[in-house]
Regions:
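Terminal, membrane-proximal amphipathic helices
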Residues: 1-33, 45-160
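C-terminal helical "lid" subdomain and adjoining coupling/linker elements of P-loop NTPases
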Residues: 39-40
Length: 160
C-alpha cells in the first residue's frame, strides 16, 4: 500500500521540475523560428503536452490517480485544472488565450534576424510561464491530496 508523500518530497519534486523548465522553454524558443506556417502551433501544442505529462508523472498524477482524485469534491476544481488542460483541445485553448502575444510571435519571425530573435524570446517566455504555472498546479493538487490523506504514487522520474 502506498504511503502519504512527505511534504519535503513534494517540494523536492517541485524544485526538480523547475530545473527542467529551461529545457522546455529552450525548445519553445527554437520552435519559434520554425518557418513553416501552422507547424509551429502543432509543435508548441506537442511540446506543452509532453511537458505536462512529464510534470504529472513526477508528482504521481497518473490516470489512475485522476480517477481516484475526482471522487473528492474538494479536489475536483484543481483536478480539472491539471488534467482537463492536458489534452490537445485544452492546449489549443491555452495557446489561443495567449492571443495577441502568440500571433505576434508567429508573424514577427518572418522579419530577418531581429524578428527571429524576438519570436524566440517570446516562445521562451511563454513556455517558461506556462510550465511554471502548471508545476504549481500539480504541486498544489499533490499537496491537497496529501492533506486529505489520499495516497498517490509519485514516480519522481523524468519522462524522456
Amino acid at each position: 500500500m502506498a504511503e502519504l508523500m512527505h511534504l519535503g518530497k513534494l517540494e523536492a519534486i517541485r524544485e526538480d521540475c523547475y530545473k527542467s523548465v529551461n529545457r522546455y522553454a529552450i525548445l519553445g524558443a527554437a520552435n519559434a523560428i520554425n518557418p513553416i506556417p501552422g507547424l509551429d502551433i502543432s509543435v508548441d501544442a506537442g511540446l506543452c503536452l509532453r511537458m505536462m505529462a512529464d510534470m504529472r508523472a513526477r508528482f504521481g498524477l497518473s490516470k489512475e490517480a485522476e480517477e481516484k482524485l475526482r471522487h473528492y469534491d474538494v479536489l475536483v476544481p484543481l483536478v480539472k485544472k491539471v488534467f482537463d488542460f492536458a489534452t490537445k483541445q485544452g492546449v489549443m485553448i491555452l495557446l489561443k488565450s495567449f492571443g495577441k502575444r502568440y500571433l505576434g510571435k508567429t508573424t514577427v519571425k518572418y522579419v530577418p534576424f531581429i524578428g527571429q530573435g524576438i519570436a524566440a524570446a517570446a516562445g521562451y517566455g511563454m513556455m517558461r510561464w506556462f510550465a511554471r504555472q502548471y508545476i504549481e498546479d500539480c504541486y498544489e493538487l499533490a499537496c491537497r491530496a496529501r492533506d486529505n490523506a489520499i495516497t498517490i504514487e509519485a514516480e519522481a522520474k523524468v519522462v524522456p
